[in-house]
Amino acid sequence: MQAKAILRHTPTSPRKMRLVAGLVRGKRVDQAKAILHNSTKSASRNVMVTLKSAVANWSQLNPDERLNDNELFVKAIFVDEGPSLKRLLPAPMGRAYRIRKRSNHLTIVVDKVENKVTK
């Protein structure tokens, strides 16, 4: 059974958040936490919080199963664009430049690692 966590309206550009999301896609949860802990990107803190929330959601959905972080993996992680705040910056000759302060929505899905037996 898989569990999902969503972080909405994060004030980070989706392009910057996707760089961090690509680092942990498909990794086991313990590996993903180690990667995020050692990352220098500011977006890694938001990904770490959402990953911990997804693991907690999984344990709530499966109260009879006790798994370590190395038995769960990041099944899916994706970043969608959120609403943009539009601001004006004064420019020369009476003009104005538009500044778009972007935001994003982060979704993480975790699932149990299936041990496949080869014959």
UniProtKB/Swiss-Prot annotation:
GO terms for cellular component: cytosolic large ribosomal subunit. It comes from the Bacteria. The keyword Acyltransferase does not apply. InterPro entries: Ribosomal_uL22, Ribosomal_uL22_bac/chlpt-type, Ribosomal_uL22_bac/org-type, Ribosomal_uL22_sf. GO terms for molecular function: rRNA binding; structural constituent of ribosome. Signal peptide: none annotated. GO terms for biological process: translation. This protein binds specifically to 23S rRNA; its binding is stimulated by other ribosomal proteins, e.g. L4, L17, and L20. It is important during the early stages of 50S assembly. It makes multiple contacts with different domains of the 23S rRNA in the assembled 50S subunit and ribosome. The globular domain of the protein is located near the polypeptide exit tunnel on the outside of the subunit, while an extended beta-hairpin is found that lines the wall of the exit tunnel in the center of the 70S ribosome. PANTHER family: CHLOROPLAST 50S RIBOSOMAL PROTEIN L22-RELATED, LARGE RIBOSOMAL SUBUNIT PROTEIN UL22M. This is Large ribosomal subunit protein uL22. It comes from Chlorobaculum tepidum (strain ATCC 49652 / DSM 12025 / NBRC 103806 / TLS). The lineage of its organism: Bacteria, Pseudomonadati, Chlorobiota, Chlorobiia, Chlorobiales.
